[in-house]
């Protein structure tokens, strides 16, 4: 999931990590 998010938006990674 992280890879997919990273591909879509660099900020997504940070948000995903915070969410997790």
From Swiss-Prot:
Plastid among keywords: yes
Pfam family membership, one: PsbW
Biased composition (Polar residues): 8-20
Main subcellular location of this protein, as a coarse class: plastid
Keyword ATP-binding recorded: no
Swiss-Prot/TrEMBL keywords: Chloroplast, Membrane, Photosynthesis, Photosystem II, Plastid, Thylakoid
Domain of life: Eukaryota
Region annotation (Disordered) ranges: 1-20
Cell compartment(s), UniProt: Plastid, Chloroplast thylakoid membrane
UniProt record, GO biological process: photosynthesis
Coiled coil: none
Gene Ontology CC: chloroplast thylakoid membrane; photosystem II
Primary role: Stabilizes dimeric photosystem II (PSII). In its absence no dimeric PSII accumulates and there is a reduction of monomeric PSII.
Record's subunit section: Part of the photosystem II complex. PSII is composed of 1 copy each of membrane proteins PsbA, PsbB, PsbC, PsbD, numerous small proteins, at least 3 peripheral proteins of the oxygen-evolving complex and a large number of cofactors. It forms dimeric complexes.
Name of the featured protein: Photosystem II reaction center W protein
Species for this entry: Triticum aestivum (Wheat)
């Amino acid at each position: 999931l992280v890879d997919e998010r990273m591909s879509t938006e660099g900020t997504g990674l940070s948000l995903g990590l915070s969410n997790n």
